[in-house]
Regions:
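Hydrophobic alpha-helical segments and helix pairs
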Residues: 46-101
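Short glycine-enriched loops at secondary-structure junctions
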Residues: 35-38, 86
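Glycine-rich nucleotide phosphate-binding loop and flanking beta-alpha elements
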Residues: 37-39, 137, 172, 205-206
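Short, charged beta->alpha transition segments
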Residues: 18-22, 37-38, 66-71, 115-119, ...
């Protein structure tokens, strides 16, 4: 996976070894990649540096925890930088939509979902929500986006329209530390759950796959994707 690159594989909990490796490589910048998951402390062996860091992290929200991690690395003279700095082509454009435009009802549902996420963001909760018309079916918790989508399938009223999945950065979230991610894998979960309408926040979403690949997968699955900036344009009646 990392052929052609200098790499080191370290167990979770060996923070001191990680810092030593970074300094040995004269690294002064760090980009965080991958899903933020909290391991059970009983399953890992912590060194002294990890123990000191864990004391600050206990039972904080994800955004707060990542800020603490970034501050810790900053104390070691290592700056945490945004993935977008190195992968600008993987950032969702401000204006983007697939072939089918949203209906007026889908547009209203997406705007309602955004209001829900805006209010929850101050509490460091959720990057995603699924609504049907004005009814909130699911809010992303510790399980992650795809698992949230999977558990929503049985909650959708198949006799009613306007079920929409929305993903965006939390209000006040530092996207340099944790930019929301969307890709083909999430599209497959949406398709299985019968959700055909997606609204995303342009310039605040990192794409797990090239945009043309996502576009093709969405069209094949019959899923319409639109950014909020494009949503303000004309929708179908």
């Amino acid at each position: 996976m990392f052929e052609g690159f200098e790499s080191v594989c370290l167990p979770v909990g060996k923070v001191g070894a990680l810092i030593a490796s970074l300094k040995q490589a004269e690294c002064d910048k760090l980009a965080l990649v991958g899903q933020f998951k909290r391991p059970a402390f009983s399953d890992i062996s912590l060194d002294k540096s990890a123990l000191a860091l864990m004391g600050r992290l206990m039972l904080t929200g994800d955004d707060a925890a990542l800020r603490i991690v970034a501050a810790y690395f900053d104390e070691q003279n290592i700056a945490v930088v945004s993935n977008a700095e190195y992968l600008p082509q993987q950032v969702l454009p401000l204006f983007y939509r697939t072939q089918r435009q949203f209906t007026a009802g889908e547009g209203d549902a997406a705007k309602h979902a955004r209001t829900v996420l805006d209010r929850l963001g101050d509490l460091d909760i959720g990057q995603s929500v699924i609504v049907q018309q004005r009814r909130v079916l699911a809010i992303e918790g510790a399980e992650g986006t795809n698992e949230m989508i999977a558990r929503t399938a049985e909650l959708i009223d198949k006799s009613q329209p306007d079920t929409v999945f929305v993903k965006m950065a939390k209000s006040g979230q530092d996207i340099a530390l944790d930019m929301p991610v969307f890709g083909v894998e999430t599209l497959s979960y949406l398709e299985k759950s019968g959700i055909r309408t997606v609204c995303l926040e342009g310039e605040k979403i990192m794409l797990a796959d090239p945009l043309d690949v996502i576009n093709a997968a969405a069209d094949e699955a019959g899923i319409s994707i639109c950014t909020f900036a494009s949503l303000s344009e004309k929708v179908d009646d």
